[in-house]
Amino acid sequence: MLQGPRALASAAGQTPKVVPAMSPTELWPSGLSSPQLCPATATYYTPLYPQTAPPAAAPGTCLDATPHGPEGQVVRCLPAGRLPAKRKLDLEGIGRPVVPEFPTPKGKCIRVDGLPSPKTPKSPGEKTRYDTSLGLLTKKFIYLLSESEDGVLDLNWAAEVLDVQKRRIYDITNVLEGIQLIRKKAKNNIQWVGRGMFEDPTRPGKQQQLGQELKELMNTEQALDQLIQSCSLSFKHLTEDKANKRLAYVTYQDIRAVGNFKEQTVIAVKAPPQTRLEVPDRTEDNLQIYLKSTQGPIEVYLCPEEVQEPDSPSEEPLPSTSTLCPSPDSAQPSSSTDPSIMEPTASSVPAPAPTPQQAPPPPSLVPLEATDSLLELPHPLLQQTEDQFLSPTLACSSPLISFSPSLDQDDYLWGLEAGEGISDLFDSYDLGDLLIN
C-alpha cells in the first residue's frame, strides 16, 4: 500500500487541515521511479538442487539476460539468427496426469425452414456399421458353433461362411477361450466346452422324473431293510429255540409244494454254518454258483420235477417206521455182536395214522453190527437231525438225487487191532528213515 508524504499526514492531536485537490501528475512527479534493490551476497541464497552452469550464449544474442533500462524498461535484443520458438511452460501441472478435455459436441445443422436436411442414400453394396460390428459377428459365429456336430467348428470354413477376415474370427475365439467356453481341439479347429448350448430341452423334465423315481426307490429300500431286519430277528428266535432245532429240516414234498418252483430246476444244498456262496454275473446261457466251506462237507441234491409214486397204499403197503434201509456196511459179516450198542431208530417219530385195512406193527428195535471197539463204528460226520429218522419210504426211495457218491467204509476212520500200532495208520505213506530214528 502506497502512502503519501509525511507532510500530507496530520499529526496526532492536531486539527486536520483540508488539502487542496491535486492532480495525479502533481502528486507523483514524472522523474520518480521504484527504488533500486541492493545487491545480495552469494552466500545469502542456499541452493536446493545442484545446478550446472548454463551454456554460454552465442555472440549477438541476449536470451540469457534481461537488462533493465534507466527507467525500468525491458530491453529486448534481437537475435542474429532464427527466432526462438514460443513454448508454454505448465509449472503448476508438473507430475499430474494429463486428462484430455471432452470436446464440445457440435449441434446439428438445422435448416431455416426447420426441416432436417435429407440424408444421402448409401449404395446398395456398402455395409453399415451394425453389419460389420463384432457383436453381430459373434452371434453368427455362435450360431455356426451350435449347428456343428459335437460342438467342433473349423475356423477356415467359418471365415468363408461369414465372409470376414480370419483375424476377426480370432478376436472372437481368443475371448471365448479366455473365459473357458471353447478349447482348441486341433489346428484351426475349436470345440465348445460350455454348458447350455447342446443340452436337451427336455432335460429338466427328465431330471424331475428321475428324482421322483429315486425317491420311490429309497422308500422301497427302506421298506426292504425293515423286512430284512424283521426276518433276521424271527430267524434268530427260530434257530435259538431248543424245541425247533430238532425240526430244522425240509422235505422234498415241501420244496415241490412251493408254486414258484414249478417247471424249474431246484437244487437243494445242505451246508454247514459259515458256508460262503458266490454267484458271478449272470449270463443268458448259464448260471454259475460257487460254494466254499471250511467247517465240513457240502451236500447238494437235485429235486426232479416228476416222481414216480406208488399206485395205491393197498397194493404196496408202507414198511414199518421202526426199520431203516440196510446200509452197505450192515451187509458185511461181523465177528462179534454187542446187543448193548443200539442206534436210535425212527420209533421216536410219531407213526402215521392207522388205516382200517392194515394195523401198524408194534415198534421194535433192530440191533446194529458191532465191532471190537467203538472207534470202528461208522459214526456220521454230521450231527443227526430229525430228517434222518423219516419213514422208510422217504429213506429208501427218496426222490432227491445226490450229486456226490455215497460214503463207504473206506471213507471212515477205523480203529486199530490188538497187534497194530500207530504206525499202521500211515501205512500208505513211505516214511523212510523217520521210523528208524
UniProtKB/Swiss-Prot annotation:
Region of interest (Disordered), ranges: 307-368
Cellular-component GO terms for this entry: chromatin; nucleoplasm; Rb-E2F complex; RNA polymerase II transcription regulator complex
Molecular-function GO terms, alphabetical: cis-regulatory region sequence-specific DNA binding; DNA binding; DNA-binding transcription activator activity, RNA polymerase II-specific; DNA-binding transcription factor activity; DNA-binding transcription factor activity, RNA polymerase II-specific; protein dimerization activity; RNA polymerase II cis-regulatory region sequence-specific DNA binding; sequence-specific DNA binding
InterPro entries, alphabetized: E2F (IPR015633), E2F-DP_heterodim (IPR037241), E2F_CC-MB (IPR032198), E2F_WHTH_DNA-bd_dom (IPR003316), WH-like_DNA-bd_sf (IPR036388), WH_DNA-bd_sf (IPR036390)
Localisation: Nucleus
Stretch list, region Cyclin A/CDK2 binding: 65-105
Function, as annotated: Transcription activator that binds DNA cooperatively with DP proteins through the E2 recognition site, 5'-TTTC[CG]CGC-3' found in the promoter region of a number of genes whose products are involved in cell cycle regulation or in DNA replication. The DRTF1/E2F complex functions in the control of cell-cycle progression from g1 to s phase. E2F2 binds specifically to RB1 in a cell-cycle dependent manner.
Protein name as annotated: Transcription factor E2F2
Gene: E2F2
